Amino acid sequence: MKLFVGEGNPQGVKVLAAAALWAQHVQIDRLQQEEKIVPFMSQPRLPVLDLENGNYLFLSNAICRYFYLSSGHDMCDLSNQWLEWEAAELQPALSAALYAHVVQGKKKEDVMATISASLKHLDQSLAGKSSPYLIKDALTVVDIVVWGSIYPLIVDASNLPEEMASLKRWFQNVSQLEQCQKAASSLLKDKGSSVFKPFLQKQPAPITPPGKSVCKEQEGEDMPSLSEEDIQAAAEAWAKGLTGASKPKQRPHPILPVEGEKNVLITSALPYVNNVPHLGNIIGSVLSADVFARYCRLRNWNTLYICGTDEYGTATETKAMEEGLTPQQICDKYNAIHTAIYQWFNISFDYFGRTTTQHQTTISQDIFHRLLEREFLLTDTVEQLRCEKCQRFLADRFVEGICPFCNYEEARGDQCDKCGKLINAVELKKPQCKICKQSPVIKSSKHLFLDLPKLEKRLEQWLEQSFSTGDWTSNARFITRSWIRDGLKPRCITRDLKWGTPVPLDGFRDKVFYVWFDAPIGYISITANYTDQWEKWWKSPQQVQLYNFMAKDNVPFHSVVFPSCLLGAEDNYTLVNHLVATEYLNYEDGKFSKSRGVGVFGDMAKDTGIPADIWRFYLLYVRPEGQDSAFSWSDLMLKNNSELLNNLGNFVNRAGMFVQKFFNGCVPEMELLSEDKRLLAQVAAELQQYNLLLEKVRIRDALRCILNISRHGNQYIQVNEPWKCIKGNQQEQKRAGTVTGVAVNMAALLSIMLHPYMPTISSVIQEQLLMPQESKVLTTDFCCCLQSGHQIGNVSPLFQKLENDQIESLRKRFGGGQVKTESKVSPSQEAPEQQAPKASGPERVKELMQELEKQGNHVRELKGKKAEKSVIDPEVQKLLALKKELALAEGKSPDPPTQKGKKKK
């Protein structure tokens, strides 16, 4: 195996590093770029990997991937998504930037601006991660490919923007690897980026891909510079007030599509009834869908949001056996629990139903008959596991064993929780009956299959159309294409169970439909339980836009199986236009697990004393949009105390208090200066970005726009000091009035923008400001909705500080990691100070060091922005507390005065 690398070719950095890491036995030859290696290519192409079987690889990412896989590593879906992003987004932008800098002589700071969105995407993806790498706790090919693309332009971490601390830290870590250092030095030869000039001069000038990149769509802070026209337009929109603005629409039920209007049908994945949803379930479907539904209503779009519990299947039967209840009793019990949890989280379903209804049976059987009549169903004999002791076939969750793909020891008979792959129960190694733990035998049973190969062509045609016109998340597209690429196979739609929708066909009447055939039909049947005019939503694809929200493991059933059923039924069903899938939310350093009780569950959240809106905010702030993210108690405290208390809450409270204290609760006259108009334009730009992002269902990123506006507001108040101006002459008092009036109108706008995310806080702000009803519609412009003379109500703080002791208590209470283990091992009533050292192992020290670094960066950022002393001091105290805790964890004195003095310098 030989690797040929061209001198001065930037793509050589990553392949040389990958070879050093994972392919030590490869022979490396360095050639001039003009030398031709691949005989069947008309033009020279380097780098090239000449494989021992006579084949060639000549894409740098493919070469890196080959080295990585050949060394025994595996690639997950997330790895492939990152490599796709790097090739489609990052590489083109970096190539153009490197060419502009090296060949055209443009300043590095100028070309850096052209890649800032991509770099910010990387920085945000790395921020808050406990791991120093992009996707795992260990280095992967993704880190090397991305680092190798960035390195030729950046060379040194000091060239990255100061505010991108997470990216700088990652870049430095990878750059310090011996293999990466050797790869870079052997190619750059101490010449820096200029070494690439001879190669780049022979290349055509790169063209930046047209249109906005994914990163720019995701990025809420990357605002374009403001022109005089922007500022003038913002001032004119402000002056119009609410004139011509649409009024909030009444929503009489049942809500039905209206011809000529934007009709939005929203579904969130039906939660399994048999268990209490955890925070990952909540953010993955119902909360994300709720934010979008509330946003649509704010825009006066005709919107219906439906959901319900998925109540059929083996999970319900096994749960009923565990609790000594009937399946129906289990469904009734847990449906009530789900309903209560979602009500507490303020999820605004228009209708929350269930699948154990007559409508579910009728509609499922109708679709089945239509598929049968059109010959889209097959009959086949299936080998299944049967427990002789229990006298039943062991479908899905009735059996557990070792995963045939990843060797996970507790894989279910339908899917592995660890690797996510779908499994046939007979494929399990060492299977056991879930009920009696006996080893089952293999027996045959006749079943019905959906003939997916026969439907594949029409499915592909529909998918291409939906991909091109709809907003599908990248993971949804990737997973769907993977299924199509691998070729569709007939899929079993029946099970040997009692609890489910009965199969209406002779020879199969003792069976029920497999849950993934009839569960998505639950969206339709739940709508039918809401209104007898359900077909206006579900058989009207021309005038309805359907949004499906779910976690990524549900994607194939919503993008392949369910649409195939509806296409095959040939009954003009509404198919999904926009499929919005999240990655996974982890818990601290582990994973949530319903069956193993790991993590915070919905019914526990309300017992913490933390309001529902704070939970909503934090879950949406860390929403796993591009990759997996993690719930962290420390980070929850940090975000509450910094973003909510010190940023958003501080601004809204000050704006209202100034009106109350200085102007007797009456909005003052406003005479705008140029700096005020510029602020209006900044706010308008953030509002436009917020709308753009939410229309694209970029929920997490749109939240940043809200926080940006409140930051602008805090800075505006701090610079203009209305509390001083009000004590001055008449002109200064007028200035105080203008600043206060603009600020309180910004607070009013924030209350509307906050509504999808924090509906209770939104209502509290609106009540405090006594906002008129007609102002509670989200417009596309920032206008003055609280005119001079408007009387506001009593203003009070919106948020409370979360204390470290409170958070540590909750961390211990909800387990996970060392604390959970300790509580089991040491139930004795030792004093807290005696127990503390047990939790201060190397893992805790590492965690504290990361928290300390993050808090230190935060304090420096606040000081750099010249924030108020009242804002900085609490953060400094938090920093000192972390230093003290770290010293204790390391067994040092917590209060070394000489070191403290040095730190203050």
Swiss-Prot record:
Q: Where does the motif 'KMSKS' region lie? A: 591-595
What keywords sit in the KW lines? Answer: Aminoacyl-tRNA synthetase, ATP-binding, Cytoplasm, Ligase, Nucleotide-binding, Nucleus, Protein biosynthesis, RNA-binding, tRNA-binding
Give the location of motif 'HIGH' region in residue numbers. Answer: 271-281
Chain intervals for the UniProt region annotation (Disordered): 813-874, 886-905
Can you tell me which residues bind ATP?
Answer: K594
Every WHEP-TRS domain range? 844-900
Q: Which SMART domains match?
A: WHEP-TRS
The Enzyme Commission number assigned here is: 6.1.1.10
Q: Does the keyword Nucleotide-binding apply?
A: yes
InterPro entries per the UniProt record, alphabetical? aa-tRNA-synth_I_CS, Anticodon_Met, Glutathione-S-Trfase_C-like, Glutathione-S-Trfase_C_sf, GST_C, MARS_N, Met-tRNA_ligase_1, Met-tRNA_synth
**GO CC annotation: what is one?**
cytosol
Subcellular location(s): the record lists: Cytoplasm, Cytosol; Nucleus, Nucleolus
Q: Give the domain of life.
A: Eukaryota
Q: What GO MF terms are annotated?
A: ATP binding; methionine-tRNA ligase activity; tRNA binding
Alphabetically, which GO biological process terms does the record hold? methionyl-tRNA aminoacylation
Record's family? Belongs to the class-I aminoacyl-tRNA synthetase family.
State the PANTHER family in the record. METHIONINE--TRNA LIGASE, METHIONINE--TRNA LIGASE, CYTOPLASMIC
Q: How does it assemble?
A: Monomer. Part of a multisubunit complex that groups tRNA ligases for Arg (RARS1), Asp (DARS1), Gln (QARS1), Ile (IARS1), Leu (LARS1), Lys (KARS1), Met (MARS1) the bifunctional ligase for Glu and Pro (EPRS1) and the auxiliary subunits AIMP1/p43, AIMP2/p38 and EEF1E1/p18.
Q: What does this protein do?
A: Catalyzes the specific attachment of an amino acid to its cognate tRNA in a 2 step reaction: the amino acid (AA) is first activated by ATP to form AA-AMP and then transferred to the acceptor end of the tRNA. Plays a role in the synthesis of ribosomal RNA in the nucleolus.
What protein name is recorded for this chain? Methionine--tRNA ligase, cytoplasmic
Q: Which organism is it from?
A: Xenopus laevis
What are the leading ranks of the lineage?
Eukaryota, Metazoa, Chordata, Craniata, Vertebrata
